[in-house]
Amino acid sequence: MSVAQHRSHYSERVRGMREPARAHNTGSFGCNAAFYNGTMSVYDSCPELCDDTYRIRLIDPRDAEDLLAVYGDKLALPFFNSDNCHGANFYCRTLHDVQESIKYWLIEYHENRGFVRFAVESLETEGVIGTLEMFRREADDYYDDCGILRIDLGVAYEREDVIYDILNLVSVPFMTLFGCAKIATKAPIYAVERRAALADAGYAAKRQPLIGHDGTHYYDYWQMLRD
């Protein structure tokens, strides 16, 4: 069942030891970050975030083949955040499924302004190793005025070092781009590499549930506050 058939976040929007966490990357923007705080929206023009390892950019139809290795891998499914997504598991059996998902993501970006789906491009391999989704949530629960970050990675990259580097690259810039006071992402108890990366990156585990559109309570969220 493809992502395109189920991910309707637009309706929700309207309603080893590692070194200590270093200073968060403010991001190398393709455009002036201050401009996004003023007259321009991320939905008008999507910037890129870059460091020496990764490039974070708007998803492109040409990413489909690389992403089949992510969404076509059943071992990756438990790490995808399907909260409030109407029971989807996001497994894509074919290249066509991925292509349809990308079409849907781009419609949500360009037409509905529901969320932004970013590709995570490895500068070392020159391939796309996963995606990030980000949107600003408005709701009558703890996660109001909160950026919800969804992280979908290939299983080879579900590692503490990789996730930490991605979080360090995007967390603060995403709060700026989306005008959020805080940012949150899900990490279930079995996602040990992800949880370690979140702790190192300055996120804290929260007990408060995210309450879905149908009243379902979702747990295992980690949050960072904007300075």
Task: Name these PLM-found stretches.
Residues 160-173:
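Conserved acetyl-CoA-binding loop-helix of GNAT-fold acetyltransferases
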